[in-house]
């Protein structure tokens, strides 16, 4: 177990594609060589989708992750409460199972029984309850870590796209683009690239908010009044930040290849080009937290649920990315811990 990590896996909405992409991922034999998975789910849900997919996976039934066995698919069984899978349908009961899985896995993570957590897609509506009043996983884990800020970071190979704002309506984006907020996101981003990706002196590109990055104030003044002065101040703090760049040309001309990270101003500005470039294989990483949480870069996929056609590449990559980030953090921690300190006489 020493060379592997223990990864908690939440089932997500059982009427979506979450169970399918989890099961399909284990057809990749590398996973059990490097990762010890612990799935939180009623067994009946997995059996339903296994039959649909004609898979014959076996599970180790355990009470808690401390009993997890290496090179096995470990399962912590949750009560199903007479739940029946209705693939493609949004139901209250499916939301309850998604929350139970998330809550139990998060609890075990907080007890250091898990090394990382990989979350399957949820429906942000039917999961809502007294204990889950969030716009998504990102906000949930941020509050559970007793933090006010985190960074939604999309990752695929060397492409990394962070978001200055997360799940905001368009009309709320501009008022949220403040220098104080940008500094918080940029500092998180810079630390993440160093600690979680082992990049020294990372270079970060900022996208403009308006078309053509504002055209010197002709199409909005956020760049001229906020973003450009912010970049100048960030450089004074020895942060390697550049821009603002017009988003369309930046991605179309592959300028992202010149940087270690890109900071988009709002959700779709970053995720649309990211998903096109990553070809459905990207990973969502919640950066800036003490824990490691990743997920696939897509939603519940109700329209294809239960049909056996869901692409599991993004979920599989989320498992491997969580493992890699965990080991990179450990490497940095060990280097810092074992740093040679010279006294004044030396």
What are these regions (language model features)?
Residues 137-140, 146:
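Acidic, PIN/NYN-like endoribonuclease modules and their adjacent C-terminal/linker elements
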């Amino acid at each position: 177990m020493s060379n592997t990590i223990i990864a908690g896996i939440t089932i997500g909405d059982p009427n979506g594609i979450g169970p399918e992409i989890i099961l399909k991922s284990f057809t990749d034999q590398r996973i059990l060589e490097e990762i010890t998975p612990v799935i939180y789910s009623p067994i009946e849900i997995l059996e339903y989708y296994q039959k649909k997919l004609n898979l014959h996976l076996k599970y180790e039934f355990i009470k808690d992750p401390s009993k997890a066995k290496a090179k096995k698919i470990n399962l912590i069984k949750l009560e199903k409460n007479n739940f029946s899978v209705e693939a493609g349908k949004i139901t209250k009961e499916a939301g309850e199972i998604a929350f139970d899985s998330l809550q139990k896995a998060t609890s075990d993570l907080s007890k250091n029984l898990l090394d990382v957590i990989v979350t399957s897609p949820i429906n942000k509506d039917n999961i809502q309850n007294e204990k889950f009043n969030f716009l998504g996983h990102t906000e949930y884990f941020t509050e559970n870590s007793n933090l006010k800020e985190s960074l939604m970071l999309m990752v695929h190979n060397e492409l990394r796209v962070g978001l200055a704002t997360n799940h905001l309506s368009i009309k709320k984006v501009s008022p949220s683009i403040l220098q104080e907020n940008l500094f918080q996101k940029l500092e998180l981003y810079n630390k993440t690239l160093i600690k979680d990706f082992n990049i020294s002196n990372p270079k970060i590109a900022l996208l403009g908010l308006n078309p053509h990055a504002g055209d010197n104030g002709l199409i909005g003044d956020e760049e001229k009044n906020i973003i450009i002065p912010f970049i100048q101040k960030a450089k004074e703090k020895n942060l390697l930040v550049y821009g603002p760049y017009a988003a369309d040309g930046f991605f179309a001309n592959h300028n992202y290849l010149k940087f270690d990270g890109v900071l988009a101003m709002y959700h779709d500005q970053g995720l649309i080009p990211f998903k096109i470039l990553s070809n459905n294989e990207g990973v969502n990483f919640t950066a800036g937290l003490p824990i490691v949480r990743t997920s696939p870069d897509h939603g519940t996929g109700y329209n294809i649920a239960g049909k056996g056609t869901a692409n599991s590449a993004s979920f599989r990559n989320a498992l491997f990315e969580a493992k890699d980030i965990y080991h990179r953090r450990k490497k940095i921690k060990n280097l810092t811990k074992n740093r040679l300190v010279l006294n004044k006489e030396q």
